[in-house]
């Protein structure tokens, strides 16, 4: 598999997960076959303000390649600057944009899954980050804000136009948060 110019030797990729994908967990997953690792979500504002605790989230294990760093935020200028800072600090191979976090403290600031309600803004963010870094940019988002607004296809098209190299779609909406999914196939007519 390839994302932009980054070759990934395994079909297994480690998803970014807040509070889970720290450096030790990423190393274990890499040793067990993950071909791509990713940090947990990192605040673009905290990177722009040079918060020391936030920089600890960027720690990598020796030889962690290919690796992605995931940032979140809703200001295109800050997101572009944060992407540059993250790449300069880590040498990561990919910048991943979190546009799917459903947690209140994130969406209440207009970040994460809140961007599902404003695809044009998401596109401006993606475009700014793509212009700011020389590595591929990817994005993770959800099926939609709620079941009445499942706009993931249109959202992906906006991001593609902005220059994003790949997307990952979380199968739940923001309203479903992390609830159990029960999908049934359509009944025959």
Regions found by a protein language model. Give the residues of each.
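Active-site-adjacent beta->alpha loops and helix N-cap segments on the catalytic face
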Residues: 48-50, 111-126, 176-182
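Active-site beta-loop-alpha junctions enriched in small/polar residues
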Residues: 17, 42-44, 72-74, 100-102, ...
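Conserved, mostly hydrophobic/aromatic
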Residues: 14, 29, 69, 97, ...
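Conserved small/polar residues in nucleotide/adenosyl-binding loops
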Residues: 183-189
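Alpha/beta enzyme core
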Residues: 84-95, 104, 108-109, 121-176
